[in-house]
């Protein structure tokens, strides 16, 4: 996720992931179902922070699920339209945390620190029963730690990518959070090694996407025929990513079109700034204008309508997997960054795309850094276009991974929070101090 919590390498979604890892089925994951709490002296008070749009959606789903358990619960915090619609009283809007890149963060740092201080003092005075920080670890973990030291139960929802790099962060996260809610099944075992309570709840995106999504409907929405040959190209959702990958991706698409002359290319733009940059790159490419479609958003629709997807490594690879599309994954970082990471051995994975990490096998070709060339990308893309039998086998593997992640994440997250609330009610569990809400 973007925002004040800098993007984690997602190459996303424990231990050394390149090694064989036993991933438990949902049914085998330790799980303590609790009855819906009945006789409470008062409805629980729950504070939350979501720092961007994706966290706002997660927060809204969690609030809805908690409301089913606690109809009179009170919710306050930092969030957006989705959380407000779910009934959260937002003291500050999530947009106030949505800054990207080191330069922008530094420019806004005094304001962000002032906001964080004001929020934590106000929420402590409000006496919450639990505080839930949703992603944005750079902002939320210090809030969680400060509140935990004053006796507030704390939850961190969405684990940083401890399986990819800096695993020792898991122990530090446990200092801030009583409970970590994880989207991926390989994450809780890492936290367990460091004595931290972490639960796999599943991924909300897997809940939202049908097992068999309607490609014909997606094509109709975009004005494409069912017989069209379609490639979706997603070079990223940030200016830096698009600058590094866009020209390479569009050259690769042009090379594919030399073999498939009637190829349609779909290019979804995450926002107006990205759209302008993508338009400039498309104008420099040799792709036929009439068959290049620059879209406002609609990334999922574009992937669903496509025969094959070319995309940057990141969360989009998970979405492409969930709509069951064969993909080729490319990524480049600044050369100096790449040399530092390789030299110091900071990354603990030998796969980068989330489908490959989840499956612990190479389901999607990955072409990184110097290997990410138009020619190599074209070769990998044509392999999918020309071998439909391989696509059929891939889709069955994607379906199994989809089922593994589809756990009704909001309900499972609410159940884990309810257990924490019950422990608090009964005085169970270690507390840093006996402060707020005790």
From Swiss-Prot:
Disulfide bonds: none annotated. Pfam families: LpxB. Keywords: Glycosyltransferase, Lipid A biosynthesis, Lipid biosynthesis, Lipid metabolism, Transferase. It catalyses: a lipid X + a UDP-2-N,3-O-bis[(3R)-3-hydroxyacyl]-alpha-D-glucosamine = a lipid A disaccharide + UDP + H(+). GO terms for cellular component: membrane. Belongs to the LpxB family. This is Lipid-A-disaccharide synthase. The gene is lpxB.
């Amino acid at each position: 996720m973007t925002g004040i919590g800098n993007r984690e390498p997602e190459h996303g979604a424990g231990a050394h992931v390149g090694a064989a890892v036993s991933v438990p089925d949902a049914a085998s994951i330790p799980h303590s179902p609790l009855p819906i709490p009945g006789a409470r002296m008062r409805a629980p008070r729950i504070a939350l922070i979501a720092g961007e749009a994706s966290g706002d959606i997660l927060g809204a789903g969690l609030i809805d699920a908690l409301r089913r358990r606690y109809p009179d619960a009170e919710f306050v915090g930092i969030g957006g339209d989705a959380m407000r619609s779910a009934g959260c009283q937002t003291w500050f809007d999530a947009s106030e945390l949505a800054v990207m890149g080191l330069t922008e963060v530094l420019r806004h740092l005094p304001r962000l620190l002032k906001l964080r201080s004001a929020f934590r003092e106000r929420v402590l005075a409000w006496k919450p029963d639990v505080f839930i920080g949703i992603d944005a670890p750079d902002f939320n973990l210090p809030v969680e730690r400060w509140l935990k030291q004053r006796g507030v139960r704390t939850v961190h929802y969405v684990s940083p990518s401890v399986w990819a790099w800096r695993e020792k962060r898991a122990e530090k996260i446990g200092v801030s959070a009583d409970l970590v809610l994880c989207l991926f099944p390989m994450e809780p075992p890492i936290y367990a090694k460091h004595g931290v309570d972490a639960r796999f709840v599943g991924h909300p995106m897997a809940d939202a996407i049908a097992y068999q999504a309607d490609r014909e409907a997606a094509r109709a929405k975009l004005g494409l025929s069912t017989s069209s040959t379609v490639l979706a190209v997603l070079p990223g959702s940030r200016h830096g990513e698009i600058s590094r990958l866009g020209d390479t991706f569009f050259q690769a698409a042009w090379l594919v079109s030399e073999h498939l002359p009637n190829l349609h290319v779909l290019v979804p733009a995450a926002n107006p700034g990205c759209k302008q940059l993508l338009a400039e790159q498309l104008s420099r490419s040799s792709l036929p204008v009439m068959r290049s479609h620059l879209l406002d958003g609609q990334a999922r629709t574009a992937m669903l309508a496509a025969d094959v997807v070319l995309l940057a490594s990141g969360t989009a690879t998970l979405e492409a997997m969930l709509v069951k599309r064969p993909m080729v994954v490319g990524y480049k970082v600044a050369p100096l960054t790449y040399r530092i990471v390789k030299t110091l051995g900071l990354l603990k994975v030998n796969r980068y795309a989330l489908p490959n990490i989840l499956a612990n096998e190479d389901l999607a070709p990955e072409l990184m850094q110097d290997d990410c060339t138009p020619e190599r990308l074209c070769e990998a893309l044509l392999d999918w276009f020309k071998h439909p039998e391989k696509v059929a086998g891939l889709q069955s593997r994607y379906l199994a991974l989809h089922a593994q992640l589809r756990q009704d994440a909001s309900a499972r997250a609410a159940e884990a929070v309810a257990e924490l609330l019950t422990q608090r009610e009964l005085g169970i569990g270690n507390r840093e101090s006996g402060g707020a809400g005790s």
